[in-house]
Curated annotation (Swiss-Prot):
Activation/inhibition comment: Inhibited by iodoacetate, iodoacetamide and by high amounts (10 mM) of pyrrole-2-carboxylic acid (PYC). Not inhibited by PYC at 1 mM.
EC number of this enzyme: 5.1.1.8
Molecular function in Gene Ontology: 4-hydroxyproline epimerase activity
Protein name, per record: 4-hydroxyproline epimerase
Binding annotation for substrate: 91-92, 249, 254-255
Amino acid sequence: MARHSFFCVDGHTCGNPVRLVAGGGPNLNGSTMMEKRAHFLAEYDWIRTGLMFEPRGHDMMSGSILYPPTRPDCDVAVLFIETSGCLPMCGHGTIGTVTMAIEQGLVTPKTPGKLNLDTPAGLVAIEYEQDGQYVERVRLTNVPAFLYAEGLEVECPDLGPIKVDVAYGGNFYAIVEPQENYTDMDDYSALQLIAWSPVLRQRLNEKYKFQHPELPDINRLSHILWTGKPKHPQAHARNAVFYGDKAIDRSPCGTGTSARMAQLAAKGKLKPCDEFIHESIIGSLFHGRVERAAEVAGRPAIVPSIAGWARMTGYNTIFIDDRDPFAHGFSMA
């Protein structure tokens, strides 16, 4: 029996939690971060569930673990952990991780104000603005994003048949826009969206195949993005992003914003250099931008960037005690 200790720096990005594991993370095998992610999932997923789920975490908890980079063009590598698993990429997690890692001196950039992250989804370039000891803003240039499928039909509880577009922005997103059986996210409660989303996700994954053309380990739809009209005067659109089993992202969701921009660009509604300001369910904003056009295995794509802010909330030394019947966490149905 052992008691495992993890030193964490806690914070949030635009309202959504980030738990940066600064000490206690396991050594991982693999020549790439995708391979290290696979090793973590095979042998150490109890760390994720123990730190993310109750009683040490909660349904919305999201986090990261820092590693030495596996590629020479990067400053640091990041493994993303949350209640839904080990995501290949996490936008709000990146902004929070970079903010806290810089402020706490956990990483020293080769060039001040810039940082290259080695993630399972690929290289993510960072620019950050620092005022004294505090990081005030982080802009990440994400992996290429693309529209994967249009008009996929699925039966939604209570609403009936709806159509969704699926886009990739670091994860696969089903995007639900206004249509005959769905009006606007504001017309439904968060509890309704949380109840419908896992059913939609399961039915879509059973009915359709979602496979990244270059990354074989990215092979399922993981998120549902419900759209709505913005309330903030600066915003172009509003969203409620569902992930995990019962979570609505409190931030505007970085990879979700990337997927949304890719969808809009594919339909001619955004072009390179266009700005896209995305509003979350609680009113916080991400400032997106289409950096340039791209291709992914012959598919039209974009390279999106996302800017946002994060704040550290404290230090947390967490024990996972093998004697504890809830050592590996639990989630209430």
